[in-house]
Amino acid sequence: MATFSEDMLIRMELTALTEPGNPVTGQLVRAIGLTETLALIRDPGSAIPAAVDPLQGVRWRQAAAARQADALRDQIAELTDRHEFRALTPGGAGWPVALNDLGDRAPLMLWAHGNPELLTASASSRVTITGARAATAYGVHVTQELAEDLAALPRIIVSGGAYGIDAAAHRAALTTGPAATMVVSASGLDRPYPPNNAELFERIVVQAGIQISETPPGQGPSRERFVARSRLLAALSGATIIPEASARSGSLLVAARAFELGRAVGAVPGPVTSASSAGCHRLMREGIAETVTRAGEVAELMDPSPFPLAPAYQQVARRAAPDHSRAARRLAL
């Protein structure tokens, strides 16, 4: 069995006890370190540090303490070793530095299966494509065209592995060759979700792609983990593209997170009569996303400097930034 450092074992335990993306975890680790953060959970009588809001700190500890179990870290370590997953930590080898932009909401660690070079590439070499699970034929078609052409540039296609737009993006990227796509999972890597896409995930790894997750092995997805994953999808890439999304699609949250991080956001327009494109139209209407219809426009969106009209667009964006920020907050609710 592989030997994991005490630091790594504590991170494994904390990821199992706390929900991903909770800023209280990040604030505590930054203020008092990993060991003392775990001690706060184990000792309900210990004082909450001044680095966090007292009420939030108490709620955080209560939720984490309720998840404690015997040999929890050992179980996670054993599954990590059994499946030969890579365990990555901030600042360590293979860590995607783009995630550091998340600050206190950055993951404590990641599990990875596949080609690690896709993680060490710059954010500008990756494009997140996500959208409707119940995709229409139109949505699948434009997704396939975008993903194939972007992968050929080349750009690494990042998505969440869901049905519909996500799966279409992964499959299209695979047609261009190896090392073309990355799956960001909301469940442990040994618990593929959705299960019917397990074969797709295996194919991605075989073709030098990669799967990653901040959820420990042995644990399934949850609503909170799907929501938290949105920030990873947004932060990993230089741009987020929504080919098709309804007004209530979870992919709008990815777009909002990307906008908040200062990443480029694009959306593909659809038929005005189609409810399946209402979310894309909202993103464009509220100034969160630029209109994109082809890979070249996505590349321009990520690096506008070579194009003569870019400065004018940037001035307009700066003038409209306050309204855009409010729109992003509404999408995140």
Show which residues each predicted segment covers.
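Short, small/acidic-rich helices and loops at N termini and domain boundaries
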Residues: M1-G94
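Glycine-biased, small-residue-rich flexible motifs in mid-sequence functional cores and linkers
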Residues: M1-M8, E19, T89-L333
